[in-house]
Structure formats: structure tokens, C-alpha cells
């Protein structure tokens, strides 16, 4: 095989550097997914079951990106056309999955308030020890009371709805909903950022693979 020219060595270096960036991005993705997963899981098992799918999916995608990026690094170092094309193919699959997950997170964000409202209203109508503990944790953490306000409890306002001197007047639906939205936006932004670097990697890896194939035929 002929020696790669300066331009192709530059492409090879670009693929390697972009894969290092993708490796780092995958760690950020895993970290962001884990952070959101831990945050959501702190506020009760019922809520966790509703929201756990998005952060877990992001963590899984991050791990896959880590493996695929390693494949890309090996393909660039070994100048292996098959590995480079496999790498590009897997990146395309991941890119589609990440874009779908990020779009779902952004779209689903608008349904958070209605779902939290239904969850908390139902919880207050049929309280159990677990639900009471869940509401107490939300109320004391976010300085809110009930689903829509302290009137949800009538005269029996719990201690978790009280500060040092006053009762919390804001309902927990908008406050806790805003918390969930912020965390979903974090996941979506990280996913979109990773997609940008992956798209660059796909284009450059395909260019490098084509050029290596041409040099092999010289």
C-alpha cells in the first residue's frame, strides 16, 4: 500500500482527535444521565418509574458511544477501511437514536406539568405512608405545599409545608415540574452536542476510508 499523503494523514489525525472528543462526550453523556437518574430517584419510586426511561437510555447510549469511539480510534490508527466504515455505520445508528431521544425529551417536557398534577392530585386523594413520605420530601425540599397550594390539605396542613414562621403558599406542581424540565433540558442539550461531533466524525471517517481504499489500489 502506498504511503498516505499529508492530506490523508491530516484526515487520520482528525478522525483520531474527534474520537477522543466523542469519548469525552460519552463520559459527559453518561454523567448527565446518571445525575438526572439520581436526582429523579430521590423523589419516590412512583415518580422514578415514570421518568427513569430517559436518563437510563442516555446512559446506555453513552456507553455504546464509548465503545464505538474506541473502534474509530483503532480504525484510524490501523488505517483499516472496514473498521472505519463499520464505525461510521454504527455512528449513524447512534446519531438517529440520540436525536430521537433528545427530541422526545424536548417534546415530552411540555407534558410534565399535567402528569405531575395528575400524580400529586391522585396521591393526595388516596394517601399512603409511601405517598405521604414522597410529598413531605418534595414539600420540604422545594418549599411548596400540596399540588396547587396549602388549600389541598384543608385545615390539616403538614409540618413539611411550613417554614420557620410561615406556610409555603406555592403549589408543588409548577415548582417540581420546573425542576424536572431543567433536568430534561440538560440531557437534551448534552445529546445534541454529542450529535454534532458524531456527524463530523462520520463525514471525516468516510472520507478517510475512501482515500485509504484509493491508495490501496495504487
UniProtKB/Swiss-Prot annotation:
<feature type="transmembrane region" description="Helical">
    <location>
        <begin position="184"/>
        <end position="205"/>
    </location>
</feature>
<feature type="transmembrane region" description="Helical">
    <location>
        <begin position="83"/>
        <end position="108"/>
    </location>
</feature>
<dbReference type="InterPro" id="IPR008952">
    <property type="entry name" value="Tetraspanin_EC2_sf"/>
</dbReference>
<feature type="topological domain" description="Extracellular">
    <location>
        <begin position="109"/>
        <end position="183"/>
    </location>
</feature>
<dbReference type="GO" id="GO:0005886">
    <property type="term" value="C:plasma membrane"/>
</dbReference>
<feature type="topological domain" description="Cytoplasmic">
    <location>
        <begin position="1"/>
        <end position="12"/>
    </location>
</feature>
<dbReference type="Pfam" id="PF00335">
    <property type="entry name" value="Tetraspanin"/>
</dbReference>
<feature type="topological domain" description="Extracellular">
    <location>
        <begin position="37"/>
        <end position="55"/>
    </location>
</feature>
<feature type="transmembrane region" description="Helical">
    <location>
        <begin position="13"/>
        <end position="36"/>
    </location>
</feature>
<dbReference type="InterPro" id="IPR018503">
    <property type="entry name" value="Tetraspanin_CS"/>
</dbReference>
<keyword id="KW-0472">Membrane</keyword>
<keyword id="KW-1133">Transmembrane helix</keyword>
<feature type="transmembrane region" description="Helical">
    <location>
        <begin position="56"/>
        <end position="71"/>
    </location>
</feature>
<protein>
    <recommendedName>
        <fullName>23 kDa integral membrane protein</fullName>
    </recommendedName>
</protein>
<dbReference type="InterPro" id="IPR018499">
    <property type="entry name" value="Tetraspanin/Peripherin"/>
</dbReference>
<comment type="similarity">
    <text>Belongs to the tetraspanin (TM4SF) family.</text>
</comment>
<feature type="topological domain" description="Cytoplasmic">
    <location>
        <begin position="206"/>
        <end position="218"/>
    </location>
</feature>
<keyword id="KW-0812">Transmembrane</keyword>
<dbReference type="InterPro" id="IPR000301">
    <property type="entry name" value="Tetraspanin_animals"/>
</dbReference>
<feature type="topological domain" description="Cytoplasmic">
    <location>
        <begin position="72"/>
        <end position="82"/>
    </location>
</feature>
Amino acid at each position: 500500500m502506498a504511503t498516505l499523503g499529508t492530506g490523508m494523514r491530516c484526515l487520520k489525525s482528525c478522525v483520531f482527535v474527534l474520537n477522543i472528543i466523542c469519548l469525552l462526550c460519552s463520559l459527559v453523556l453518561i454523567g448527565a444521565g446518571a445525575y438526572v437518574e439520581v436526582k429523579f430517584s430521590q423523589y419516590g419510586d412512583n415518580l422514578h418509574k415514570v421518568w427513569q426511561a430517559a436518563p437510563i437510555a442516555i446512559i446506555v447510549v453513552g456507553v455504546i458511544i464509548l465503545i464505538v469511539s474506541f473502534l474509530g480510534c483503532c480504525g484510524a490508527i490501523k488505517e483499516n477501511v472496514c473498521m472505519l466504515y463499520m464505525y461510521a455505520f454504527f455512528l449513524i445508528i447512534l446519531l438517529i437514536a440520540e436525536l430521537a431521544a433528545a427530541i422526545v425529551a424536548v417534546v415530552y417536557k411540555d407534558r410534565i406539568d399535567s402528569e405531575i398534577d395528575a400524580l400529586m392530585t391522585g396521591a393526595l386523594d388516596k394517601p399512603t405512608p409511601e405517598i405521604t413520605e414522597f410529598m413531605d420530601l418534595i414539600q420540604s425540599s422545594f418549599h411548596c405545599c400540596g399540588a396547587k397550594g396549602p388549600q389541598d390539605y384543608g385545615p390539616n396542613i403538614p409540618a413539611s409545608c411550613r417554614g420557620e414562621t410561615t406556610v409555603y403558599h406555592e403549589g408543588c406542581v409548577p415548582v417540581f415540574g420546573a425542576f424536572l424540565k431543567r433536568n430534561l433540558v440538560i440531557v437534551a442539550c448534552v445529546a445534541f452536542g454529542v450529535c454534532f461531533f458524531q456527524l463530523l466524525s462520520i463525514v471525516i471517517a468516510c472520507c478517510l476510508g475512501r482515500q485509504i481504499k484509493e491508495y490501496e489500489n495504487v
